[in-house]
C-alpha cells in the first residue's frame, strides 16, 4: 500500500489500543494516543524526576559551590549526593574515579579528547569502530588530525564485539557500549578493557545508550572514562563524565572559568582541580545545571526501584517487535536480536514520509541516519531509515498498534 492510501484508510480500521492503566507509574501525563518511540534520542521523564527539578527551582534555587547561605548549602549537599550515587550505581570506587557534569555525551567526549595529550600518555594509535555515533567518529577524527596520529576504524562483529587482535599496543580506544542503530552490545567489553590496559593503552566508553537499560554492563568496568547523557536515562538534559583520576595527568585544560580556580593574579592562576576533592572542576567551568544534576539523582533512585514486572514488560515488547520486523518480507531490519533500539526500512517507502504518516497516528519515531552517517550511508549504502526505540513508558498494546499499521505495507 502506498503512503497516500495508507493515510486515507488507517483511521478507519485501526483502533487506539493503548491503555493508560497499563503504563509504568510516572508517565500518567501521557495522553492515551501518544506513543513515544524515540527514547534513544531522549527518554521521557517520570513525574518524580520532574518534581525533583521543580523542587530545586521552588525551594532552593541557588549557585552551587559558591555561596554560604542555606539554599546554596542544600544545593551543594544534593549535588554531591548525585556524584556519590553515580559511582555507587556503577560500583566504582571514589578513590579511583570522579564525576563531572557537562552538556551531553557529545560534549563530554569532545572535552576529553580536546584536552588529551597522546605524547604524555605514550599513545601511538587511535582506535574506534564503524558503528559509532558522530560524537565518537568525529571527535576521534579531529584528534587524529590535530596530533597526526593514525586513526583506525575497526569493524564490529555481529554481536557487537571488537576484535582484540586488531587493537595495537599503546592505543587510545574510543567506542560505544551499545549502538544507537541496532542495539548491538559490546559483548567483550570487560576483555577489551583488560586487554587495552595490558597493552599500555587507554579506553574511553560512550555509554549513552547503555545506562538506561543495561547499566549492569558497566558495573566495575574499569575504563579510563565513561560518558553518557542524563536525558537518555530518564533524567533532565545533562552530560555526565565518570573519569579515572589517573587519566588527568594526560590532559591539558582547554576551558577555564569560574569555579575552577582558587585564585587569579594578573598573569597566573591557582587551579582548584589540582586538589583531589575538587578534581571534578577540571571539566566544570562556570555555573552548572544544578537542578538537572539533582534530578538525575532522583532518576537513578527511580530506576533502582523499578519492579521486575516493568523490566519484563520492556523485554517482552522488544521481543515482540523484533519477531515482527525480522519476519516481514518487505521490511529490512538491521537488528540481529531483540533490543530496545530497532532500525529498518520498507521497500519503496520513503522513511521520512513514513515517519510523518506515523506521527499522524500519534506514533513518534525517528527517520534518517541517526548521526551514524559513515556506517549507514557510506559503508552499507542504505537509504534513510526508521528507528523505533523503546522505553519503560511503552506498553504491549502500543507495540501491537505499530505492528498493525506496518502490516499494511
Regions found by a protein language model. Name each.
Residues 1-409:
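Pyridoxal 5′-phosphate
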Amino acid at each position: 500500500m502506498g503512503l497516500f492510501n495508507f493515510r486515507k484508510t488507517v483511521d478507519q480500521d485501526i483502533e487506539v489500543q493503548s491503555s493508560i492503566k497499563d503504563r509504568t507509574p510516572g508517565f500518567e501525563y501521557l495522553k492515551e494516543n501518544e506513543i513515544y518511540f524515540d527514547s534513544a534520542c531522549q527518554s521521557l521523564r517520570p513525574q518524580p524526576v520532574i518534581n525533583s527539578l521543580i523542587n530545586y527551582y521552588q525551594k532552593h534555587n541557588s549557585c552551587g559551590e559558591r555561596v554560604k547561605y542555606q539554599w546554596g548549602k542544600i544545593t551543594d549537599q544534593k549535588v554531591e549526593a548525585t556524584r556519590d550515587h553515580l559511582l555507587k550505581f556503577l560500583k566504582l570506587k571514589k578513590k579511583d574515579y570522579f564525576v563531572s557534569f557537562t552538556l551531553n555525551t557529545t560534549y563530554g567526549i569532545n572535552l576529553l579528547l580536546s584536552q588529551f595529550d597522546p605524547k604524555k600518555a605514550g599513545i601511538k594509535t587511535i582506535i574506534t569502530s564503524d558503528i559509532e555515533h558522530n560524537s565518537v567518529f568525529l571527535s576521534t577524527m579531529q584528534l587524529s588530525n590535530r596530533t597526526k596520529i593514525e586513526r583506525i576504524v575497526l569493524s564490529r562483529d555481529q554481536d557487537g564485539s571488537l576484535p582484540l587482535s586488531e587493537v595495537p599496543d599503546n592505543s587510545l580506544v574510543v567506542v560505544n557500549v551499545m549502538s544507537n542503530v541496532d542495539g548491538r552490545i559490546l559483548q567483550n567489553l570487560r576483555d577489551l578493557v583488560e586487554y587495552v590496559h595490558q597493552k599500555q593503552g587507554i579506553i574511553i566508553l560512550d555509554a549513552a545508550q547503555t545506562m538506561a537499560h543495561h547499566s549492569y554492563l558497566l558495573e566495575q568496568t574499569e575504563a579510563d572514562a565513561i560518558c553518557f547523557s542524563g536525558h537518555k536515562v530518564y533524567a533532565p538534559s545533562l552530560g555526565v563524565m565518570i573519569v579515572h583520576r589517573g587519566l588527568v595527568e594526560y590532559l591539558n585544560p582547554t576551558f577555564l572559568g569560574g569555579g575552577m580556580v582558587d585564585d587569579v593574579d594578573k598573569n597566573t592562576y591557582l587551579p582548584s582541580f589540582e586538589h583531589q576533592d575538587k578534581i571534578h572542576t577540571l571539566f566544570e567551568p562556570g555555573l552548572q545545571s544544578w537542578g538537572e544534576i539533582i534530578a538525575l539523582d532522583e532518576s537513578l533512585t527511580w530506576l533502582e526501584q523499578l519492579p521486575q514486572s516493568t523490566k519484563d514488560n520492556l523485554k517482552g515488547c522488544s521481543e515482540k517487535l523484533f519477531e515482527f520486523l525480522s519476519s516481514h518480507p518487505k521490511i529490512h531490519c538491521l537488528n540481529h536480536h531483540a533490543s530496545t533500539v530497532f532500525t529498518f526500512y520498507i521497500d519503496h517507502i520513503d522513511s521520512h514520509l513514513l515517519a510523518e504518516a506515523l506521527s499522524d497516528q500519534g506514533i513518534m519515531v525517528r527517520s534518517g541516519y541517526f548521526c551514524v552517517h559513515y556506517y549507514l550511508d557510506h559503508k552499507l549504502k542504505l537509504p534513510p531509515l526508521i528507528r523505533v526505540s523503546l522505553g519503560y513508558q511503552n506498553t504491549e498494546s502500543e507495540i501491537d498498534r505499530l505492528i498493525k499499521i506496518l502490516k499494511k505495507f
